[in-house]
């Protein structure tokens, strides 16, 4: 598995999981599951056709790339629900004050994480912080 990860590269889903796992003690797999739909929405500006191809191969509904990407992220959220994986950091139980106190540190260090360089869309500290906030509150990524 490690060889596959090394060859595939991982992107900001893992960058976030590394840093929030360390701060909030979220198991890595659970963190990745929570973050994946948000990261797909963030990345779709850079690679929506690729995500749409995945959705098509899964026979998900949609005519446009945006509709197909939405179907893909909805499917992931439904899978998470079926396994009792929370959809947000707030639902996971991360205290809001603790989150606010840590988000700058997490965002900055997630940008510096080794996995960030392989993400299909570049991201800076401010965008990473905003993405974290969307993940905490469950807001649809719109930037």
Residues covered by each model-derived region:
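Active-site segments that bind and position negatively charged phosphate/pyrophosphate groups
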Residues: 1-78
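C-terminal charged capping/lid subdomain of soluble metabolic enzymes
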Residues: 51, 61-143
């Amino acid at each position: 598995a490690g060889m596959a990860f090394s060859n595939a590269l991982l992107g900001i889903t893992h960058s976030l999981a590394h840093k929030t796992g360390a701060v909030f003690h979220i198991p890595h797999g659970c963190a990745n599951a929570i973050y994946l739909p948000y990261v797909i929405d963030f990345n779709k500006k850079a690679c929506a056709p690729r995500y749409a191809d995945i959705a098509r191969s899964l026979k998900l509904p949609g005519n446009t790339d945006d509709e197909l990407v939405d179907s893909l992220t909805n499917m992931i959220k439904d899978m998470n629900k079926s396994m009792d994986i929370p959809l947000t950091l707030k639902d996971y139980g991360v205290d809001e004050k603790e989150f606010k106190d840590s988000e700058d540190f997490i965002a900055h260090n997630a940008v510096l994480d080794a996995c960030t360089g392989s993400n299909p869309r570049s991201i800076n500290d401010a965008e990473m912080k905003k993405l974290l906030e969307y993940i905490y509150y469950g807001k649809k990524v719109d930037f």
